[in-house]
């Protein structure tokens, strides 16, 4: 998109988009929210996060937006605590409470499913979990909310074009009953349609 070859794309969350704009200087606008891929915690070794033992290992994605998301997921589960006010920039250095002395391992997001047997539990993005045959509804031992997920993907356009008629039309089709039915049937709850705004 930055080269002008594309007018729009749809694959990133808002924190990821903001990080890319900040670090790479892209001139993009968020047009509308599309779908959410709720992040889940998966394990081959435990059935519940309550089963974590002292010194066990947990893994999170190592890219800026998804590491924060994974750490926040473990925090929501009551496993760790992050520094107050850290927002969308948390890394493992921002963990202020880790009562079970868990080893927090940062790995490339796409590698997390392959490394699942090497750690006690891992926070995995749904697209990579699905690619490994994992279902958030059937295999995750903890996950982000499926409805009103705080990390929807967004439809992104070149700066100054978010109110173009064609973009409004795409938004309308994206949020139609037919699209909602397709997503529900195709992804069986692992991907959920977000409200437009």
Where are each of the predicted segments found?
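A bilobed periplasmic-binding-protein/Venus flytrap-type ligand-binding module shared by bacterial periplasmic
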Residues: 38-49, 151-164
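Ligand-binding "clamshell"
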Residues: 19-31, 44-46, 118, 123, ...
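Short, glycine-/small- and polar/acidic-enriched structural segments
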Residues: 2-47, 95
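A conserved helix-loop-strand patch within extracytoplasmic ligand-binding domains
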Residues: 31-80, 180
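A local structural motif
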Residues: 54, 79-106
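Short helices/loops that flank or line small-molecule/ion binding pockets
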Residues: 1-7, 22, 72-73, 93-123, ...
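Short amphipathic alpha-helical coupling segments at ligand-binding clamshell hinges
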Residues: 54-56, 162-173
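Periplasmic-binding protein-like
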Residues: 68-75, 174-194
